[in-house]
Amino acid sequence: MASRNIWCVRRNFLFDLRDWMLQYSAEVFLKSISFRPFSAECDSKDKESLEEEREDLLSNLVTMGVDIDMARRRQPGVFNKAVTNEQELKLFLLSKGASDKVIGSIISRYPRAITRTPESLSKRWDLWRKIMASDLEIVNILERSPESFFRSNNNLNLENNIKFLCSVGLTHKCLCRLLTNAPRTFSNSLNLNKQMVEFLQETGMSLGHNDPRDFVRKIISKNPSILIQSTKRVKTNIEFLQSTFNLNKRDLLLLICGPGARILDLSNDCTKKNYTNIRERLLSLGCSEEEVQRFVLSYLNMVFLSEKKFNDKIDCLIEEKISASQIIENPRILDSSINTLKTRIRELSHAGYDLSTSSIALLSWSQRRYEAKLKRLCG
């Protein structure tokens, strides 16, 4: 009897459980059906809202004078951001003295600027002002290189870089030059800047410099861009100078602390290619290996000239009956453009000045000095 009662209880429980499950499943099914249109409606509203925001963004940017096509090419992802701060950025830059035209140009070339918050911008600006003398100086840098300021919003990294560069003995004047000429230095990771400074210190010591910090200051002051290059590139260029000109440690040290510092950040391929062209061109004009090396060492800026520019200038001078030996003795004349060279050669010829037998140094003089000389020649 007890067994029968237990069986009845179990059967009733199972039937009740089945009824409850059927009822619950139906409710879930009906709820899922009833919620689907609502969910689709929400998605549609969100999409419409996002599209409206993007239309609003485009409208704002056009009003601000932004070149939309340029901005899309450079950083298209910015236009998909749900939140942007273009109006806040405009007000911030206006308060610092930037014109509407400059602001439009900045955003056109670096659209990501509109994703920075006012708080981050203000903090970063204050850090830059510790180096620069005025807001206008910073605005000028942003106009030339907006990426340098807006590329990173890691203000702690910027602050640490400033402290580190001060700690290695860079003067306020040197920091100002860095921020003006190579602002990306301050967006580098702190470790990257440390690696380059340590490399330069070790290089100075290996060449016999008794003050590694002073060596670093000299190199950076002469070539502010060096900190945004790789240690491999700088090392390869130093090795190139040493092997090409057969320099001992003392002479190499003097060279890279002086005029050689400027070419340390050049592309290694560019350095070798340009030097090879200079050498081959001058040898073809009858110059000796010694004359070629003396010519380049006396004015290392020659290495910056591309193959075409160098050859065109040499051809221009040779056509005007100026000898290779005269060019070797006056390398700075190659700083002048071809148009300047041709104009001055023509004017001097009309004034009765014989460049084939007289000094050609005046071809590289400043315009003011040259005009004074020409006036005297013309009587």
Swiss-Prot record:
Keywords of this entry: DNA-binding, Mitochondrion, Phosphoprotein, Repeat, Transcription, Transcription regulation, Transcription termination, Transit peptide
Gene3D superfamilies hit by this protein: Transcription termination factor 3, mitochondrial
Highest taxon in the source lineage: Eukaryota
Site feature Interaction with DNA, where: 144, 184, 332
Record: transit peptide: 1-37
GO BP: DNA geometric change; DNA-templated transcription termination; regulation of DNA-templated transcription; termination of mitochondrial transcription
Repeat is among the record's keywords: yes
Location in or out of the cell: Mitochondrion
Entry comment on modification after translation: Phosphoprotein with mostly four phosphate groups. While the DNA-binding activity is unaffected by the phosphorylation state, only the phosphorylated form of the protein is active for termination activity. Functioning seems to be regulated by phosphorylation.
Disruption phenotype: Double knockout of Mterf1a and Mterf1b results in viable animals with no gross phenotype, and normal oxidative phosphorylation capacity. Steady-state mitochondrial DNA levels are normal. There are subtle effects on levels of mitochondrial transcripts: transcripts initiated at the light strand promoter and also downstream of the MTERF binding site are increased, levels of 7S RNA are reduced, while levels of other mitochondrial transcripts are normal.
Location of the region described as Interaction with DNA in the Swiss-Prot/TrEMBL record: 151-152, 229-233, 306-313, 337-340, 366-373
Expression by tissue: Predominantly expressed in heart and liver, with extremely low levels in other tissues. Expressed strongly in the heart and at lower levels in brain, liver and kidney.
SMART domains hit by this protein: Mterf
Record GO cellular component, one term: mitochondrion
The keyword Zinc is assigned to this record: no
Name of a matching Pfam family: mTERF
MF annotations from Gene Ontology: double-stranded DNA binding
Family listed: Belongs to the mTERF family.
Assembly and binders: Monomer.
Domain characteristics, as noted in the entry: Contains nine structural repeats of about 35 residues, where each repeat contains three helices. The repeats form a left-handed superhelical assembly with a solenoid structure that wraps itself around DNA.
Function: Transcription termination factor. Binds to a 28 bp region within the tRNA(Leu(uur)) gene at a position immediately adjacent to and downstream of the 16S rRNA gene; this region comprises a tridecamer sequence critical for directing accurate termination. Binds DNA along the major grove and promotes DNA bending and partial unwinding. Promotes base flipping. Transcription termination activity appears to be polarized with highest specificity for transcripts initiated on the light strand.
Name the record gives this protein: Transcription termination factor 1a, mitochondrial
Taxonomic source organism: Mus musculus
